[in-house]
């Protein structure tokens, strides 16, 4: 098995079908798709199975635990991760795999969907500028919705740390000590604007807190409120 895709999911029966359909349209099909059912109380597991995904159950509530469970269950040499409310563009995996030579991890940009065209453009270009800056500073900013890494390398550094947020970024920092972590600008993933439910200012303040190491929890409302 060359490539596994892992999706952590807590009560995602509504969003998950669109994510799995987006993966089915990939120009570079993954060898397996794993949905980690993270203490769901809805039909997340049944939805995943209906789409042919392999379901892994993680009873310990928290996205870091779910990602770690997916990493351990994956059979692929490479493991890509996205979120259950995200829509990888059709060439997402193809773009990442094309740039993998010599790298231990790769990541790409995000754009919100479900917002106005202006807000979508703002989210994408603002995030791209941030990623370019971090890449220049050699501070890779892996995002759980758009990342891929060598499974062996991730296991070597212990996988995802047990934190409430930034588990993806912290894994990226650890992987960067082993080898190149590469930014791939054309490997785009669309992600749900439900993260903006409280508005742009609270969202940006939360991201700043996360960046400064004072993360907010993901399960504040019983769901994954990243």
Model regions and ranges:
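A recurrent flexible, glycine/aromatic-enriched loop bordering the glycosyltransferase active site
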Residues: 112-117, 130-148
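Short aromatic/hydrophobic "clamp" motif used to bind/position activated sugar donors
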Residues: 79
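Glycine-rich, basic loop-to-helix element that forms the pyrophosphate-binding segment
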Residues: 58-74
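Cell-envelope/extracellular polymer assembly enzymes that use nucleotide-activated donors
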Residues: 2-4, 32, 170
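Conserved donor NDP-sugar-binding/catalytic core segment of glycosyltransferases
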Residues: 91-118
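Short, well-formed alpha-helical segments that are part of the catalytic scaffolds
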Residues: 11-25
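Acidic donor-binding loop at a coil-to-helix junction in glycosyltransferase catalytic cores
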Residues: 165-171
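A conserved acidic beta->alpha catalytic loop
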Residues: 22, 29, 37-45, 86
């Amino acid at each position: 098995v060359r490539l596994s895709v892992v999706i952590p999911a807590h009560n995602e029966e509504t969003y998950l079908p669109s994510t799995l359909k987006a993966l089915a349209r990939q120009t570079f099909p993954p060898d397996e798709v794993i949905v980690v059912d993270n203490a769901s109380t809805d039909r997340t597991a049944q939805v995943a199975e209906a789409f042919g995904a392999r379901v892994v159950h993680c009873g310990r509530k928290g996205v870091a635990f779910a990602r770690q469970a997916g990493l351990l269950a994956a059979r692929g040499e490479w493991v890509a991760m996205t979120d259950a409310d995200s829509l990888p563009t059709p060439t997402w995996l193809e773009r990442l795999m094309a740039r993998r030579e010599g790298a231990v991890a790769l990541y790409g940009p995000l754009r919100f969907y479900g917002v106005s065209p202006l807000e979508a453009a703002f989210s994408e270009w603002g995030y791209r500028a941030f990623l370019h800056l971090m890449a220049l500073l050699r501070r890779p900013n892996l995002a759980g919705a758009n990342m891929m890494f060598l499974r062996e390398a991730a296991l070597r550094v212990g996988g995802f740390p047990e934190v409430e947020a930034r588990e993806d970024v912290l894994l990226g920092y650890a992987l960067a000590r082993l080898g190149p972590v590469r930014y791939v600008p054309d490997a785009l993933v669309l992600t749900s604007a439900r993260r903006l439910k409280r508005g742009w200012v609270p969202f940006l303040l939360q991201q700043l807190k996360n960046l400064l190491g004072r993360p907010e929890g993901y399960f504040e409302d019983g769901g994954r409120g990243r």
